[in-house]
């Protein structure tokens, strides 16, 4: 490390342009690097190898956003032991070994990114929020040890089952939109969940989610559901999406006291639902999209 106000000779000062405040480019010295900057937020678009290597001089960085195109080597990030929030998008990554043993990362957001090996995610047991959007995922075995997760976003992948989630008892928010899932049975014991986005899957049976008494938001649009009788037991539901399914009878929703919004676009309901139940729901002040 250089002394005084001299930065390390291999420090890429273009990083300064990426700090969170767009109206102020900070003057960085070696003293400042050594002493803190505990709330550093860096956003890099198509980072160069020099920029990534320079991040090792910012050990107190807490939040990092990388927007990339093409291959990227993230090994230089292994020294960022205080990193709490990491976002990566549009990259090709061989692995995420740099996170192995990290005890600080609480929020990880990886989207539109190809990763050859996800196994090191299993060591991030302190994670509270995980987003893996459009990452070509077809296996969740690595995720079963992340028991403290509260928010999980897995949309636009190739998942067929959710078995790996069946012991994630802290989970409150789950987004599995745009997969190939046909069974929600693995969620039956996750009674803390209050928000599920499960549109664009192959779900036909919703009986397995009746134990989820805290559900306030449920989106099942673009599935194969025909019977919504089980939903009548989810008395905390406020928002429900059942658009583009095979539902004929909407009457089970009459018993939901907190319901405020229903999306039924593309469904062909029977005469009784069209003439009686839907008007009655609207009369209660419920917004219905049809």
Label for each model-derived stretch:
Residues 1-109, 120, 124-125, 131, ...:
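N-terminal capping/linker segments that flank leucine-rich repeat
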Residues 214-271:
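Ankyrin-repeat and related helical/solenoid repeat scaffolds used for protein-protein interactions
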Residues 129-139, 150-158, 173-178:
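Solenoidal tandem-repeat scaffolds enriched in leucines and small polar residues
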């Amino acid at each position: 490390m250089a002394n005084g106000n001299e930065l390390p000779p291999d420090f890429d000062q273009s990083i300064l342009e990426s700090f969170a405040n767009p109206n102020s480019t900070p003057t960085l010295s070696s003293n400042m690097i050594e002493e803190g900057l505990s709330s550093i937020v860096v956003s890099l678009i198509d980072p160069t190898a020099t920029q990534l290597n320079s991040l090792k001089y910012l050990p107190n960085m807490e939040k990092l956003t990388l927007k990339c195109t093409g291959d990227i080597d993230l090994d230089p990030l292994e020294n960022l032991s205080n990193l709490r929030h990491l976002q990566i998008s549009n990259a090709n990554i061989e692995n995420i070994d740099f996170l192995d043993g990290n005890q600080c990362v609480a929020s990880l957001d990886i989207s539109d990114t190809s990763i050859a090996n996800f196994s090191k995610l299993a060591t991030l047991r302190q994670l509270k929020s995980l987003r893996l959007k459009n990452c070509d995922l077809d296996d969740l075995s690595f995720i079963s040890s992340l028991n403290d997760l509260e928010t999980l976003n897995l949309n636009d992948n190739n998942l067929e089952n959710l078995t790996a989630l069946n012991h994630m008892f802290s989970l409150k928010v789950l987004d599995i939109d745009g997969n190939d899932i046909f069974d929600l049975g693995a969620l039956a014991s996750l009674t803390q969940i209050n928000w599920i986005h499960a549109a664009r899957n192959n779900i036909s049976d919703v009986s397995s989610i009746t134990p989820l008494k805290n559900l306030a938001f449920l989106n099942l649009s673009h599935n194969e559901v025909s019977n919504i009788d089980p939903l009548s037991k989810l008395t905390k539901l406020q928002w429900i999406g059942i658009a583009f399914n095979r539902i004929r009878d909407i009457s089970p929703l009459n018993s939901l006291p907190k319901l405020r919004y229903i999306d039924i676009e593309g469904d062909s309901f029977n005469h009784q639902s069209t003439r009686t139940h839907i008007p009655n729901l609207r009369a209660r002040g419920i917004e219905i999209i049809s």
